[in-house]
Amino acid sequence: MKSQIVIFIALVMLGACSGPANSGITQQPTLADYQVGEKWVWKYKGVTTEGEVRSDGEETREIVSVNGVLGMTIGNDTIPVTDIVKPDESETPKYDWPLEVGKKWKYENNWTSQDGTTGNQSQDAEVLSYQEETVAAGTFMAYTIKYTGKTSNSRGYSANEEEVWLYAPAIKNFIKLTQNQGEFSYAEELIDYSKPK
């Protein structure tokens, strides 16, 4: 499950966005929106309905320079920022740019986990609001994006799921995620954000 979430969060990073214009519409950022030393830290926890803790920890991502090329560290990997800001050409993207309140679209994702299990997500997405939201890291203007649908895998698992992402354009990232999938609930919250002065 954790590997699915890591893949999913990496996809979210591929949809990072810049701040909304006066019109309330948010465009995707450019390479210039990131700087070396920018850092995000989240606390996450996943629990079954029976109380079994399946994941519990922290995740840190940071913008680094590798041979003069900007990258984002995600676990043991470093993803070039140029990949993060590259437009998603899919007809069923994670984010349908530009973002604005009331926008709806279909999101579909096929994936393969590290153990070879394949799976599929099919969700209806809607931007519900854009307002101040408070998490452990502070208060940010954020979009609330709700995804509802189904996930299944090659091992016979199938479940309805609902995900709510609070996405803060000013920091180009999500500040909170809550996910309910079958008998499993997962939550992730930003506990620290910093950038060079």
Where are these regions (language model features)?
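Acidic, serine/threonine-rich low-complexity disordered tracts
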Residues: C17-P80, V85-K86, N109-K197
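Short Pro-Gly-centered flexible turn/kink motifs
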Residues: W105-Y107
